[in-house]
Amino acid sequence: IGFVRRRDFRRNYMQLQFTPRPTTPLIRKLRNELSFDYITTLDGRLESRQLRYLLAPEFQNGDEWWLEYNRDFEFLSKPFEIATDVVLPIGPYASESIYSAYNLGPQRPVNGWVGFIRGSFFGGTRTQVKYFGRIELSPILSVEPRISIDWINLPQGHFISKLVSGSFNYTISPRSFFSALAQYNTSTDSFSTNIRFRWEYEPGSDLFVVYTEGRQTDDRGFPVLQN
C-alpha cells in the first residue's frame, strides 16, 4: 500500500529464532521465528506494536515455504488518506493477518516467490497477492519482475491497489554493473524509473551514476514529469 516516514519515536525490538534440522528426508531445516516490535512516541504513548511468528521449512531441494501470523496495533494521531477519497480517521486500530508464501531456491535459473496475505486492516479487511521473480538469462544478465495487488475493504471505502515493477541487471565486469528499475503504482497514479551504474575503480572505492525520474499518470496523454 505504501510507506510513511516515522518521526520522533522510541523503538524496542526482540527476536527469537530456533532452527532445528529434522531427520525427515524431505525437510533440511525448520526455521521458527518469534519477534515483537514496540514503538512509542518520545513521551511514551504507544504508536505501533507488532507480534509476529514465522514457521519456514526449507526443503532438501532448496525451496522454502513460509507461514506467518501477525498481530498488529497502530495508532493514527491524525487523519490519513490511504487512497483517493479514502481517509482513515484518528484512533487506535488492531489487526490480525496470515501470510503464506512459497520461495523457489536461488539455484534455479527461474526463481522467486509468490505470496498471499489475508486479514483485518484498519477496521476493514485486506487481501493481497504478490509475486517476486528472478530470471537468469545468462551469468551476467538477469531480469526481476514484481507485482503486488491489494483488495482493501474499509468502512470509509473500497479500492484496489496495484504495484507493478521490473528491473534489469547487467554485470559488465567483476568491478562494474548496470541496473534499471521501472515501477507503476495505481495508488499514487505514478510511474517511476531508476537507472544506476556502478564502477569500482580501485578496491574499496566506487563511483555511482544514478538517474531517477517520477511521473504522474492521472492526466491524459504522456505522463507529466513530477520530479
Model-based region annotation:
Residues I1-N227:
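Exposed, low-structure sequence patches enriched in small/polar residues
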